[in-house]
Curated annotation (Swiss-Prot):
EC number(s) from the headed UniProt entry: 3.1.2.28
Annotated keywords: Hydrolase
Reaction(s) catalysed (UniProt annotation): 1,4-dihydroxy-2-naphthoyl-CoA + H2O = 1,4-dihydroxy-2-naphthoate + CoA + H(+)
Pathway(s) it belongs to: Cofactor biosynthesis; phylloquinone biosynthesis; Quinol/quinone metabolism; 1,4-dihydroxy-2-naphthoate biosynthesis; 1,4-dihydroxy-2-naphthoate from chorismate: step 7/7
Pfam families with a match to the protein in the record: 4HBT_2 (PF13279)
InterPro entries found in the cross-reference section: DHNA_CoA_hydrolase, HotDog_dom_sf
Protein name as catalogued: 1,4-dihydroxy-2-naphthoyl-CoA hydrolase
Purpose: Catalyzes the hydrolysis of 1,4-dihydroxy-2-naphthoyl-CoA (DHNA-CoA) to 1,4-dihydroxy-2-naphthoate (DHNA), a reaction involved in phylloquinone (vitamin K1) biosynthesis.
Active site: D20
GO molecular function: 1,4-dihydroxy-2-naphthoyl-CoA thioesterase activity
Amino acid sequence: MTSPDHWLKLERQVHFGDTDAAGVMHFHQLLRWCHEAWEESLERYGIAAGSVFPGCRGQQRWPAVALPVVHCQADFKRPVHGSDRLQVHLKPQRLDPGCFEVRSEFHLDATVMACGLVRHLAIHSDSRERCALPETVDLWLEASALGQITSL
């Protein structure tokens, strides 16, 4: 089995278009980067985008379970500039059978530059009622927690 680091430790290149007129990362980019890192993590783990996200090319039908964002936050610790190569560390956590969050830390070398959190809630796509997480996401969460000590 591949180590969780394979899908939980990623890289992000800061592009010119990610920055504002002062050459610093524009604030709204951080949450987009958090979501994109989560998408990449799922893909690296082996979960096809079409099994989680609606509207993917070639998708026969939308997933039965939707995972809307119900909470997010962002903390900016240090300025992030164009051409920075950031290491992204993901820390997913199941909160209950139908809810999870992914904390993202963006590092430049050993310095934490920014942190983000995105929380998702599982709902049936048709009824919009709460439900359990999709099995693939549940397995990703379980595999991501391997080797970590968690409280009961």
